[in-house]
């Protein structure tokens, strides 16, 4: 082999070697890239799998949360949990309850809480539970309002007197203290304040609530005028629940004897009556002394007239309105038989003696009869006349001391006296059991008061009779009375129709017969009382 051939062979060999190296290098690079690509793909697949798993887990978690939230929306509201057995009650049964009891609920927040058809549907302090369970079942106003009150909502309760309103606001009030104060409920001073228009009604509310407060170790006191203040000052210092009339309470506030800064549960009972008696400014001044935030406010009353709505809108926060029966239009209890007799005014007292013989003869001799006069002087005269004719009569009117009025009510309630003679001071709110007959000796100044008077009978599902003596002097009220009689399906005497059926709109002393309609769905404006 020539030298050139050897050289050429060596050159080619070197070229092949370079090519091999390049190829090897390329193969190595390709292999590395392939490996990297595979690793990237594995990482991506792994990541995708992980993300998919997390997404699925999150989705399942969200579904679970939505499911829980759905249950929570229907069963738990602001600390109030609907009972499991209550949730199982068919909707048809709930609808029947609302229809049968003529229940209407205005609730802009759409909570739709179910009424408590049984005491077993509510969870309270065991001592309270034991006390209320002595009754067969909650009354309609209790059944519907308790869930909203236990959920901390402001509530307007409108129902006829004798419907269980005192326990409707009283049971949640006392449970509220026990829940918020724990083992030391007495450390926070006055926490529940109930304002009532009259001394008699305040005393009645106190008598009902003290049964509960005694059971759970709370102090309750009743504050009203006509008696010395010394004992009331002492009681206010140690009480957690206070029932009061506006005038006396304001006096004690101004003296520094009543500290309302911890009141978180405020009740206005018979609010319309308090406005009629001119207590609006007193009420505002009292409210100013309570907590401005975190206060639960309630109105419980037999009627809900337009003149009260504006007041409610100033200090209630999106209230739930619970109405039992027809409350926007004046209506009488349909369980009461109404008899209206048109008579000469000079023959009324002789007629009264005839009626007492009729309603208290034979087996009815001990039946309770409540007689209404219009003025205290008239009441005093009629009382003397009845005593002269051999009747044992108890009386309540403005010329009597508070102690005399309290004794008279006690005699009538316990049966030591079967006749109670009263002016309209006793017409509103008083719970006098088993009154068989109401006699209106003199017709009241308004038909509203007539409805409240006759509402002293036919209470708590019972029947009763109201016998009214109507004279030409009241003919301007004939039209309104006819409407009430027709609304309750009662007969209207021809003599009454002769006075005409025109209805005069009720007038306010300041605003006349023109009221502003108030939209209660609007949120209350926050105001500061100066």
Curated annotation (Swiss-Prot):
User: What are the protein's UniProt keywords?
Assistant: ATP-binding, Coiled coil, Helicase, Hydrolase, Nucleotide-binding, Nucleus, Ribosome biogenesis, RNA-binding, rRNA processing
Q: Which superkingdom heads the taxonomic lineage of this protein's source?
A: Eukaryota
Q: Which Gene3D superfamilies match?
A: P-loop containing nucleotide triphosphate hydrolases (3.40.50.300)
Catalyses which reaction(s): ATP + H2O = ADP + phosphate + H(+)
Q: Where is this motif: Q motif?
A: 117-143
Task: Give one GO term, molecular function aspect.
Answer: ATP hydrolysis activity
GO CC annotation, single: nucleolus
Q: Record's Pfam families?
A: DEAD, Helicase_C
| Coiled coil regions in record | 19-58
EC numbers on record: 3.6.4.13
Composition bias (Basic residues) maps to: 21-50
Question: Kind of enzyme, top EC level?
Answer: hydrolase
Region Disordered: list its residue ranges: 1-77
Motif position, DEAD box: 269-272
Hydrolase as UniProt keyword: yes
The primary site where this protein sits is nucleus
Entry's family note:
Belongs to the DEAD box helicase family. DDX5/DBP2 subfamily.
Protein name in the entry: ATP-dependent RNA helicase DBP3
Q: Which organism is the protein's source?
A: Vanderwaltozyma polyspora (strain ATCC 22028 / DSM 70294 / BCRC 21397 / CBS 2163 / NBRC 10782 / NRRL Y-8283 / UCD 57-17) (Kluyveromyces polysporus)
Q: Gene of origin? A: DBP3
């Amino acid at each position: 082999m020539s030298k050139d051939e050897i050289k050429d062979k060596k050159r080619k060999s070197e070229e092949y070697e370079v090519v091999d190296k390049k190829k090897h290098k390329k193969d190595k690079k390709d292999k590395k890239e392939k490996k990297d690509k595979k690793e990237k793909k594995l990482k991506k697949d792994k990541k995708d799998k992980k993300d998919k798993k997390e997404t699925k887990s999150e989705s399942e978690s969200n579904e679970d949360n939505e499911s829980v939230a759905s249950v929570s929306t229907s069963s738990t509201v602001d600390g109030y949990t609907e009972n499991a057995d209550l949730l199982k009650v068919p909707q048809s049964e709930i609808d029947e309850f609302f229809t049968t009891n003529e229940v209407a609920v205005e609730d802009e927040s759409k909570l739709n809480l179910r009424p408590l058809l049984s005491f077993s549907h509510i969870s309270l302090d065991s001592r309270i539970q034991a006390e209320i369970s002595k009754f067969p079942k909650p009354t309609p106003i209790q059944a519907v309002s308790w869930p909203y009150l236990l959920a901390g909502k402001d509530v307007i309760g409108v129902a006829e007197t004798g419907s269980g309103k005192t326990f409707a606001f009283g049971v949640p009030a006392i449970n509220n203290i026990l829940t918020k104060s724990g083992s030391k409920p007495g450390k926070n001073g006055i926490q529940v304040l109930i304002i009532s228009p009259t001394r008699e009604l305040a005393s009645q509310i106190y008598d009902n609530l003290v049964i509960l407060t005694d059971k759970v170790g709370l102090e309750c006191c009743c504050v009203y005028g006509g008696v010395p203040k010394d004992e009331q000052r002492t009681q206010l210092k140690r009480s957690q629940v206070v029932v009061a009339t506006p005038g006396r309470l304001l006096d004690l506030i101004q003296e520094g004897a009543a500290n309302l800064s911890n009141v978180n549960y405020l009740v206005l009972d018979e609010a319309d009556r308090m406005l009629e008696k001119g207590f609006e400014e007193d009420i505002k001044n009292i409210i100013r002394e309570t907590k401005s935030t975190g206060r639960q406010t309630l109105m419980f009353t037999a009627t809900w007239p337009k003149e009260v709505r504006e007041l409610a809108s100033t200090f209630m926060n999106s209230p739930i309105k619970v109405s039992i029966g027809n409350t926007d239009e004046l209506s009488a209890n349909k369980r009461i038989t109404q008899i209206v007799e048109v008579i000469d005014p000079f023959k009324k007292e002789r007629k009264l003696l005839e009626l007492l013989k009729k309603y208290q003869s034979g087996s009815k001799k001990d039946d309770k009869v409540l007689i209404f006069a219009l003025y205290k002087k008239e009441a005093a005269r009629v009382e003397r006349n009845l005593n002269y004719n051999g009747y044992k009569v108890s009386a309540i009117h403005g010329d009597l001391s508070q102690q005399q009025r309290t004794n008279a009510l006690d005699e009538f309630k316990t049966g030591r006296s079967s006749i109670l003679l009263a002016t309209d001071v006793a017409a509103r709110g008083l719970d006098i059991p088993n009154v068989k007959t109401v006699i209106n000796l003199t017709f009241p100044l308004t038909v509203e008061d007539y409805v409240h008077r006759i509402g002293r009978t036919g209470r708590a599902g019972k029947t009763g009779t109201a016998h009214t003596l109507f004279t030409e002097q009241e003919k301007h009220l004939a039209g309104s009375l006819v409407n009430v009689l027709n609304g309750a399906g009662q007969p209207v005497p021809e003599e009454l129709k002769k006075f005409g059926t025109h209805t005069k709109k009720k007038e306010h002393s300041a605003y006349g017969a023109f009221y502003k309609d108030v939209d209660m769905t609007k949120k209350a404006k926050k105001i500061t009382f100066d």
